[in-house]
Amino acid sequence: MQKLGSGVITTTHDVDCVEFDWGKIQFLSEPAVTDADRFSFGVVELSQGKGHARHNHPGSEEVIYVISGEGEQMVDDKPPVKVGPGASIYIPADVYHSTVNTGGETMKLIVVYSPAGPERLLREIPGAKVTPPAG
């Protein structure tokens, strides 16, 4: 991690890795890392054939951006739609949703929560394994 004026530069080697049975997430910007409190920003990897169960984020909006891989996105309990690289999904606060990797490779996503908060709750999910920074 490197300070740059009042900003911060982080890499995945600088932050915790939170692992689940469906994949992993690393938050490159969150209150505990960069002091940002209006949003958190993370990189998600969904394992082949896996995804996270239907859930919501009370009080926080979410944007998901697909970097690579193919999947299905459900929002508001509507039938899931196919998503792939370049897709951006906006999810209003409190709305139930899920993402499943349906492709033949790891699905990489960027997630942003506003305001920050869901990143703390993810660490408390039963079965979550938090690995300290590698760097």
Question: In which residue ranges do the predicted regions lie?
Answer:
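A generic "binding-loop/recognition-motif" signal
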Residues: 50, 59, 70, 79, ...
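Short acidic-glycine-tyrosine-enriched beta hairpin
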Residues: 77-93
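Short beta-strand His + acidic residue motifs that chelate non-heme Fe in jelly-roll/DSBH
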Residues: 53-55, 73-74, 91, 97-104
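A short, N-terminal "cap"/entry segment at the start of jelly-roll beta-barrel domains
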Residues: 1-39, 53, 124-135
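Short, conserved beta-strand element in jelly-roll/cupin
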Residues: 43-47, 56-73, 112-114
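A short beta-to-alpha transition loop/helix N-cap that caps and shapes the active-site region
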Residues: 117-123
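Short, compositionally biased
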Residues: 103-107, 111
